[in-house]
């Protein structure tokens, strides 16, 4: 299913800001939504650790089948979260803590 323009543009903006803030420190990429239904939208890798983020246009946006399953499944040994504009700073702060990255670098890009 195609993403709404709002979600797609938010996702692109988030990915761009992450890549710029942590250039050389992370690999951040989108997943292919057509491959496995429910796999989170973004994969961020830093050293031996990884994070999976499921991007939503808002806190009230509906979740698709299997999204919660994959967030919980991979969250056991990695960082996973739903992310939307209302919780962005909290999620990125926690992700930076997980990776050992400086959260202030992201704030400079926001």
Spans of model-derived segments:
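Catalytic phosphate/metal-binding cores of nucleic-acid and nucleotide-processing enzymes, i.e., regions
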Residues: 1-110
């Amino acid at each position: 299913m195609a993403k709404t323009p709002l979600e797609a543009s938010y996702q692109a903006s988030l990915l761009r800001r992450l890549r710029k803030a942590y250039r050389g420190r992370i690999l951040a990429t989108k997943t292919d939504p057509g491959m496995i239904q429910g796999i989170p939208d973004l994969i961020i890798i830093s050293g031996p650790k990884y994070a999976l983020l499921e991007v939503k246009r808002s806190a009230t946006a509906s979740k698709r089948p299997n999204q919660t399953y994959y967030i919980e499944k991979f969250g056991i040994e990695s960082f996973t979260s739903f992310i939307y504009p209302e919780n962005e700073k909290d999620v990125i702060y926690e992700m930076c803590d997980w990776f050992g990255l400086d959260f202030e670098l992201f704030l400079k890009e926001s």
